[in-house]
Amino acid sequence: MSTTANPLLAEINKGTDLKHAETQDKSAPIIENVPIKKNDHSSLLGEVEKGAQLKHVETQDRSAPVTEGATVKSNNHSALLGEIKSKAQE
């Protein structure tokens, strides 16, 4: 099937004329008379290599579960089964 047989494809192939647009240079700073300084990477790297003084801190490990006062109740399983059997026989 050729593109000329389909009018929609023919219109797409023809293209369209674009309007002229003016661009605005927005690379300059918005505020007037502001000096733009370069980053001094060597001084930053020097500060990183020098390191920082850290102070000693005490930590409290609270990752363990709180189990104080938790008790396991007695399981009277045989009494429960006996009660079920007696009601089933009635």
Swiss-Prot record:
WH2 domain span: 4-21, 40-57
One Pfam family named in its UniProt record: WH2
Keyword Repressor: no
Disordered, as annotated region: 57-90
SMART domains assigned: WH2
Gene Ontology MF terms in the entry: actin binding
One cellular-component annotation, GO: cytosol
Keywords: Actin-binding, Repeat
Record flagged with keyword Isomerase: no
InterPro entries assigned to the protein according to its UniProt record, in alphabetical order: Actobindin, WH2_dom
Subunit text: Monomer.
Functional description taken from the UniProt entry: Is able to bind two actin monomers at high concentrations of G-actin. Inhibits actin polymerization by sequestering G-actin and stabilizing actin dimers.
Protein name per UniProt: Actobindin-B/C
